[in-house]
């Protein structure tokens, strides 16, 4: 049973014998690096980098469901990229704008 499933994965059009498997697998490194950056201070976050990560994730999520063969590894890595990019952008926006607004209110008050 396990052998037949493993063989089916190996021979799949988006399996390990193709670029359709390895490209998204290595792309997970970007999402993992973005997750590791959750611990870094928000002032070090780059708007342009996170916008690129977010847009790439969103665009390729759609494309990964249209292409043949369907590549769910590509879809999942791009969902992760979009999610981590949105989270990082949220952290940066809160740091740049919300904390400044709170500081201004405290100064006035």
From Swiss-Prot:
Gene Ontology cellular component annotations, sorted alphabetically: mitochondrial inner membrane; mitochondrion
TM segment ranges: 19-35, 51-67, 74-90
Protein name: Mitochondrial pyruvate carrier 2
Function: Mediates the uptake of pyruvate into mitochondria.
Chief subcellular location: mitochondrion
GO annotation, biological process: mitochondrial pyruvate transmembrane transport
InterPro entries xrefs: MPC
Keyword Thylakoid set for record: no
Pfam families with a match to the protein in the record: MPC (PF03650)
Keyword Transport: yes
Keyword annotations of the record: Membrane, Mitochondrion, Mitochondrion inner membrane, Transmembrane, Transmembrane helix, Transport
Its membrane topology: Multi-pass membrane protein
Family as reported in the entry's similarity comment: Belongs to the mitochondrial pyruvate carrier (MPC) (TC 2.A.105) family.
PANTHER family the UniProt entry points to: UPF0041 BRAIN PROTEIN 44-RELATED
Subcellular location: Mitochondrion inner membrane
């Amino acid at each position: 049973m396990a052998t037949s499933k493993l063989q089916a994965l190996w021979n799949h059009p988006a399996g390990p014998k193709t670029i359709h498997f390895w490209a998204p697998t290595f792309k997970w490194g970007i999402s993992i690096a973005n997750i590791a950056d959750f611990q870094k201070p928000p002032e070090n976050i780059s708007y342009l980098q996170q916008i690129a990560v977010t847009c790439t994730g969103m665009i390729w999520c759609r494309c990964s469901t249209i292409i043949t063969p369907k590549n769910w590894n590509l879809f999942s890595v791009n969902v992760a990229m979009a999610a981590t990019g949105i989270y990082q952008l949220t952290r940066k926006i809160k740091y740049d704008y919300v904390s400044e607004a709170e500081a201004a209110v405290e100064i006035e008050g």
